[in-house]
Swiss-Prot record:
GO cellular component: A band; C zone; M band; myosin filament
PROSITE patterns reported in the protein's UniProt record: FN3, IG_LIKE
Region (Disordered): 1-59
Domain Ig-like C2-type per the UniProt entry, residue ranges: 48-149, 249-338, 339-429, 430-530, 531-630, 830-923, 1039-1132
Record function comment: Thick filament-associated protein located in the crossbridge region of vertebrate striated muscle a bands. In vitro it binds MHC, F-actin and native thin filaments, and modifies the activity of actin-activated myosin ATPase. It may modulate muscle contraction or may play a more structural role.
Stored Pfam families: fn3, I-set, THB
GO aspect biological process, one term: cell adhesion
Domain Fibronectin type-III: 633-729, 731-826, 926-1022
Organism: Gallus gallus (Chicken)
Family to which the UniProt record says this protein belongs: Belongs to the immunoglobulin superfamily. MyBP family.
Protein name (record): Myosin-binding protein C, fast-type
């Protein structure tokens, strides 16, 4: 057949295109109205109520060209001019803002609106589905279409033109096909296509910018769906290549690292390296230009530019930038803070309602962030009227302006490296009497003053006389000055006598005193009158006793009379008082003698005697002065026991009670090292043992005690030794029995769930008989591990066991075993657990040590015996047996010790045995009778006999060496050969050889070789080459599919490829079939065949492209066919 001309294919292609267009334009037959036409994209049936006269059609365009789609809308029937929007995908609106999209709108005389969308230089990223939406007030309509972009077509019109034939004839049979021209052109074509694809396979600029800014992987799928990108995998590959290929910097050789970290207070260096030392460089911090200073130091070292930041603080934690002209590099500096610790912690405080509370703590760093907690709950700054937070350098304050009862709690300050806790106790405000009123005895016309002092300056009150309120008048004055309340009565009269009471407002408290009126009767006295003391001292001594508080003033006013005026003397025992000044003095008047002690002391207590004398007579009286004081401090204050948050304090009464009975005691406590004491009770405590609660476990405390009597409070006692509230642990858990014998039981347990700050010092194990309550200690000393073997138990008894954990706080509650245990040996059949490596022959070399541990089991303890082949063990073999294993030991192995050793374990009539096969080996002796049996050509046959001594091991092989008799240099020709004969080849002609052989076993080769007695002489002879006839092989074979087609299910609109592999010789002719019909030159299908791999590419398949596809291969030897099913799914 003559070679077809170039024009013929073009004409045929034009005819096919015309026929295809005719088929496409021809209306479908009436009887198949409901079926879709056989096309890739079936035309959409227009909605009869739609606004479109013509809708945009699906378009296929080559990459790099412009494409235009148009839509026509009838505007005559619309209430207003229509407006059109173009979308890619579902939401991406196309507009004039993009440089590659142009929109046009025109109207003709019939009010038909034409809208056009033009995309210039179409790229592969423009492929996808598009939507056109038209609106006119409330009317709305839309339609969809697609744009498919294909690679630019080759300029070659006919592939057959690339083929050449080697023959001179022009028919098909002349010569063989020459593919060289095609391959050369294809190489150029592939390079051009690849270059063109790299240039054209770009995304639109707006999509590309979106893809560059994506941080989450899920965003890629959303963008692809939004902009109609169907080739998601290709998009990701392209984007990955762009990310992997960093842009090479022209200014920087080495840029900054992405991030740096430095500890607070240290310095850090940021280093870049420039390509040119003359380039200008600037440093920025958070966008602000940095200038050289003592903190920021700039250095130039060759091409390196260094920024040094000294004494980094939290303010230096920022983003830094280095600029060289238009190029930049960035980094972040993270300043790491050291953990902030609490240097001085909080202190316990005790206040009353309304007081101002300041909780103060000091931390290790200024400006540190702290957290305040109240009973474990964060104290927020929302309650600004109640809580106030203050910072002063390293000190932090929590201020409560007016304390309330609800503020009583444990307060904690927390930092990232420590914490401190303190207790705040708010009590009801108590009114204290600082100075009580005293009884008064006044004369007529004198002034009476009642005065008292209370603890609160703001407290007011009222005065009463015999239950009737006293009102101010000209003679009666009531005053209130700070803590002092005063009632003054001028010109006292007899009716003013009575009981006076002061009652503070709002308190159930009253202060009382008595006013005695001393009436003076004027009588006629003769000139001579004996002296007389006007005191009634005839009663009991208690009535004549005057009680005074130490430190107060004592004034004994004694009325006297007599004519002439008597002489007054005061005595205490033999001591005579005459002084008129000083701490103790006497004031004398005509009718009154006063004995005054300015500040009473304990030594002033005693009997005082006053004597008055004149010439007429003498009189005397005795007064008892009793000085009372606050008691001495309590003695022997100590802490007797502690708990998790409590401690028991005990003490002894003071040796001196101050002259008044002890009414009770007051207690205080503080944290060790603190200066602030906190009261534990406001009302006196009568006993000498007190339990303090609400303490913090693990914190050291100190306590002290005050004694109280009617006079006041004593000095504090000595502080107790520092103690720590620690609770006993909870009971141990999971108490179980592990083992039991006739007299022992092994108990195991787990540590307590709650241990606390005191830890666990050890455990006690106790046992008792079932039904009894008498517990017997199994161990006298604490055991630290969680297990104990109790020994000396009664055999056959049922016993209960319990475990108690002990720490410095005491014993925990016991954990008792649930069931009683019968103390009797549990019989367990003896069994030897022979290790796996000892179940076969155990091989050791001579001189090595043998140390084998063979475990066994059985209860009670089995009896273990060893024997060697029924006899006793050699003296060199030693055994040691424990409760659970036996040790077989040989210090230095020798060959006579090889053999079978038997181990037996026996319990009563039960027995188990195991055999240990021991073999002690060494190197073998040399082989025997090595001789050359035959010599031919360049070969020699050697033969020998096994060695007499095999080293007590099997001979694993032989090593053969040869040597030329002239040089006697030995060369190994064979190793690990098991037969006792071998052939040595490739010997040099004309030489004479001697051979030697080594024997070999598991220990190695023999010490000495065995040398052959005779030699092998290789004679020189001529060589003859005999050619083997060559038989040509028939390589022809029928076609056979190595990889058949596989059923596929794809989504409509996504390109699919069907692949298979075939072999055969001569090369088979391949035909693709669809539904048993041959696929012609349809541009929708592209078939490829390379090195036996066949592929059929189906572009953008539609629902009607589904069916059965087949591939048929035919050559002169036969035919082969493979088929598959292709299902095309339409997305919902």
């Amino acid at each position: 057949m003559p070679e077809p001309s170039k024009a013929a294919p073009k004409k045929e292609a034009k005819k096919k295109e015309e026929k295809k267009e005719e088929k496409k334009e021809a209306p479908p037959p009436q009887e198949h109205k409901d079926e879709a036409p056989d096309d890739v994209h079936p035309p959409e049936t227009p909605d009869p109520e739609g606004l479109f006269l013509s809708k945009p059609q699906n378009v296929m365009v080559e990459s790099g060209r412009d494409v235009t789609v148009s839509a026509r809308v009838a505007g005559a029937a619309l209430p207003c001019a229509p407006a059109v929007k173009w979308f890619k995908g579902k939401w991406a609106e196309l507009g004039d803002k993009s440089a590659r999209c142009r929109l046009r709108h025109s109207v003709d005389d019939d009010k038909v609106h034409t809208f056009e969308l033009t995309i210039t230089k179409v790229a592969m990223g423009d492929r996808g589905d598009y939507r056109c939406e038209v609106t006119a007030k409330e009317q709305k309509d839309s339609c969809s279409f697609s744009i498919d972009v294909e690679a630019p077509r080759s300029s070659e019109g006919n592939v057959l033109q690339a083929f050449k034939r080697t023959g001179e004839g022009k028919d098909d049979t002349a010569g063989e096909l020459d593919f060289s021209g095609l391959l050369k052109k294809r190489e150029v074509q592939v390079e051009e296509k690849k270059k063109k694809k790299d240039e054209d396979d770009q995304f639109p600029p707006e999509i590309w910018e979106l893809l560059k800014g994506v941080t989450k992987k899920s965003e890629y799928e959303r963008i692809a769906f939004q902009y109609g990108i169907t080739d998601l995998r290709g998009m990701l590959k392209r984007l990955k290549k762009v990310h992997v290929e960093p842009k090479k910097s022209e200014a920087f050789i080495r840029k900054l690292d992405p991030a740096y970290q430095v500890d607070k207070g240290n310095k850090i260096k940021l280093v870049v390296e420039l390509s040119d030392p003359d380039l200008p460089l600037k440093w920025y911090k958070n966008g602000q230009l940095l200038k050289p200073s003592t903190k920021y130091v700039f250095e130039n070292v060759g091409l390196k530019r260094i920024l040094t930041i000294h004494k980094c603080s939290l303010a230096d934690d920022a983003a830094y930038e280095c600029r060289v002209n238009d190029e930049k590099c960035f980094t972040e500096v993270f300043v790491k803070e050291p953990p902030v610790t609490v240097v001085r912690g909080l202190e316990d405080q005790q206040v009353v309602v309304g007081d101002r509370v300041v909780l103060e703590a000091e931390v290790s760093e200024e400006g540190a962030q702290v957290m305040w907690l109240k009973d474990g709950v964060d104290v927020t700054r929302d309650d600004a009227f109640k809580y106030r937070f203050k910072k002063d350098g390293k000190k932090h304050f929590l201020i409560i302006n007016e304390a309330e009862l609800s503020d009583s709690a444990h307060y904690k300050i927390m930092t990232n490296g420590g914490e401190s806790e303190a207790e705040l106790s708010v009590e009801e405000k108590q009114l204290e009497v600082l100075q009580d009123m005293a009884d008064l005895t006044v004369k007529a016309s004198e002034q009476a003053v009642f005065k008292c002092e209370v603890s609160d300056e703001k407290v007011t009150g009222r005065w009463f006389r015999n239950g009737v309120e006293v009102k101010p008048s000209k003679r009666i004055h009531i005053s209130h000055n700070g803590r002092f309340h005063k009632l003054v009565i001028d010109d006292v009269r007899p009716e003013d006598e009575g009981d006076y009471t002061f009652i503070p407002d709002g308190y159930a408290l009253s202060l009382s005193a008595k006013l005695n009126f001393l009436e003076i009767k004027v009588e006629y006295v003769p000139k001579q009158e004996p002296p007389k003391i006007h005191l009634d001292c005839s009663g009991k001594a208690a009535e004549n006793t005057i009680v005074v508080v130490a430190g107060n003033k004592v004034r004994l006013d004694v009325p006297i009379s007599g004519e002439p005026a008597p002489t007054v003397t005061w005595k205490r025992g033999d001591q005579l008082f005459t002084a008129t000044e000083g701490r103790v003095h006497i004031d004398s008047q005509a009718d009154l003698s006063s004995f005054v002690i300015e500040s009473a002391e304990r030594s002033d207590e005693g009997r005082y005697c006053i004597t008055v004398t004149n010439p007429v007579g003498e009189d005397s009286a005795t007064l008892h002065v009793r000085v009372v004081d606050v008691p001495d401090p309590p003695q022997s204050v100590r802490v007797t026991s502690v708990g998790e948050d409590w401690a028991v304090l005990s003490w002894e009464a003071p040796p001196f009670d101050g002259g008044m009975p002890i009414t009770g005691y007051l207690m205080e406590r503080k944290k060790k090292g603190s200066m602030r004491w906190m009261k534990l009770n406001f009302e006196v405590f009568p006993d000498t043992t007190y339990e303090s609660t609400k303490m913090i476990e693990g914190v050291f405390y100190e306590m002290r005690v005050f004694a109280v009597n009617a006079i006041g409070v004593s000095q504090p006692s000595l502080n107790t030794q520092p103690f720590m509230p620690i609770a006993p642990t909870s009971e141990p858990t999971h108490v179980v029995l592990e083992d039991v014998t006739d007299t022992t039981a092994t108990i195991k347990w787990r540590p307590p769930e709650r241990i606390g700050a005191g830890g666990v010092d050890g455990y006690l194990v106790e046992w008792c008989r079932e039904g009894s309550n008498e517990w017997v200690a199994a161990n006298t000393e604490l055991v630290e591990r969680c297990g104990l073997t109790a020994r000396g138990l009664p055999t056959g008894e049922r016993l209960l066991f319990r475990v108690i954990s002990v720490n410095m706080a005491g014993k925990s509650p016991p954990a008792t075993m649930a069931q009683p245990v019968t103390i009797r040996e549990i019989v367990e059949r003896p069994k030897i657990r022979l290790p796996r490596h000892l179940r076969q022959t155990y091989i050791r070399r001579v001189g090595e040590q043998v140390n084998l541990v063979i475990p066994f089991q059985g209860k009670p303890r089995p009896q273990v015996t060893w024997s060697r082949e029924g006899g006793a063990l050699p003296a060199e073999v030693q055994t040691r047996t424990s409760d659970v294993d036996s040790v077989f030991f040989i210090r230095s192995a020798a060959r006579p010790l090889s053999g079978n050793y038997e181990m037996r374990v026996r319990i009563d009539n039960m027995e188990d045995c195991a055999t240990l096969r021991l073999r002690v080996v060494e190197r073998p002796g040399p082989p025997q009778a090595v001789r050359v049996m035959e010599v031919w050509g360049s070969n020699a046959l050697l033969q020998w006999e096994p060695p007499k001594d095999d080293g007590n091991a099997e001979i694993s092989g032989y090593t053969v060496q040869k040597a030329d008799t002239r040089t006697m240099e030995w060369f190994t020709v064979l190793e690990h050969s098991r037969p006792t004969r071998c052939t040595v080849s490739e010997l040099v002609m004309g030489n004479e050889y001697r051979f030697r052989v080594y024997s070999e076993n598991v220990c190695g080769t023999s010490q000495e070789p065995a040398t052959s007695h005779n030699t092998a002489r290789i004679a020189k002879e001529g060589l003859t080459l005999k050619m083997v006839p060559y038989k040509e092989r028939d390589l022809r074979a029928a076609p056979q599919f190595l990889t058949p087609l596989v059923d596929r299910s794809v989504v409509a609109g996504y390109t699919v490829t069907l692949n298979c592999a075939v072999r055969g010789h001569p090369k088979p002719k391949v035909t693709w079939l669809k539904n048993s019909v041959e696929i012609g030159a349809d541009p929708k299908f592209l078939s490829r065949h390379g090195l036996g791999v066949l592929s059929l590419l189906i572009r953008r398949p539609g629902p009607f492209d589904g069916g059965t596809y087949g591939c048929r291969a035919v050559n002169e030897m036969g035919e082969a066919t493979t088929e598959c099913r292709l299902d095309v799914r339409v997305p919902q």
